[in-house]
Amino acid sequence: MAAADDLAFHEFEEAANLLAETPDAATTSQSDKLTSQEHVAVVVGSGIGYGAEGEEEDDKTSLLQDEKPQPRFWTFDYYQSFFDVDTSQVLDRIKGSLLPHPGHNFVRHHLRNRPDLYGPFWICATLAFVLAVTGNLTLVLAQRRDPSIHYSPQFHKVTIAGITIYCYAWLVPLALWGFLRWRQGTRERMGLYTFLETVCVYGYSLFVFIPTVVLWLIPVQWLQWLFGALALALSAAGLVFTLWPVVREDTRLVAAALLSIVVLLHALLALGCKLYFFQPLPLDHVVPAPQAIPPSPNVLLPSSVQPMTTF
């Protein structure tokens, strides 16, 4: 205890000497330092707590702003998101539909859970318009080669082409999606595309027929059938490669039957367009060539009439 008191007294003397040398210096005790440090620590800690709470509140506010209510399916806002694509995305999906190969899933590699209706809508509209126009141009070119052919514009082909293409691009995917959804209940491991993804796959698969229809203007029958077969093979292969990951876990009979029906319906569409819009001309469009009518035996020809002589 004596040693401690001597040390304290010695420190007090040193402090007194320092004060004597610098009387204007400010003095603070150790307790004041500790109190101020504790106060600073409390203030800093409370500031950090308030900052963290503020950041959490900001995050919650941003999440609430991001989670906007989804529009109803009967409103235009609901379908607006399906047309929100740029040119590069549409071109990439068209390229994917033109170059199918095994192991390349169109939905997984090109749609990426973002199906669009912009591409299928305009592809169907373009195909219907090109079918009607080229069907009429075929008659015009035939009339130029053979003047005996009578041509009249067939505007009803525009309506028929539009109804056929749009019904196929929407009703067939609807039936296919419904069947796969029904089979999903019996086979729990089966994956399933959404209805809009199925429509998108069918819409882009029809793009290959647009240049094919233009090439059908070449007036060579075997070449037209060759172009049609190539287009059908590319388009049907894209559908089969895309649907195979969905149906492969089903029974072999169901998978084979479903893919066969898909290819058959695709072939019927191509065959129907070829035979209807590029069919041979009916007989009422061919004007028969004028034929020479033999003169009646009772009619005297001018050369056989002899002038009368007068006496």
Curated annotation (Swiss-Prot):
Location relative to the cell: Golgi apparatus, cis-Golgi network membrane; Golgi apparatus, trans-Golgi network membrane; Late endosome membrane
Family: Belongs to the YIP1 family.
Quaternary state and interactors: Interacts with YIPF6; this interaction may stabilize YIPF2. May also form a ternary complex with YIPF1 and YIPF6.
Keywords for this protein: Acetylation, Endosome, Golgi apparatus, Membrane, Transmembrane, Transmembrane helix
Family matches, as Pfam families: Yip1
Membrane topology note: Multi-pass membrane protein
TM region(s), chain numbering: 121-141, 160-180, 199-219, 227-247, 253-273
Organism: Rattus norvegicus (Rat)
GO biological process: one example: vesicle-mediated transport
Disulfide bonds: none
GO CC terms: Golgi apparatus; Golgi medial cisterna; Golgi trans cisterna; late endosome membrane; trans-Golgi network; transport vesicle
Segments on the Cytoplasmic face: 2-120, 181-198, 248-252
Positions where N-acetylalanine occurs in the chain: A2
GO molecular function: small GTPase binding
Lineage: Eukaryota, Metazoa, Chordata, Craniata, Vertebrata
Topological domains, Lumenal: 142-159, 220-226, 274-311
Keyword Cell membrane in record: no
Name this polypeptide is given: Protein YIPF2
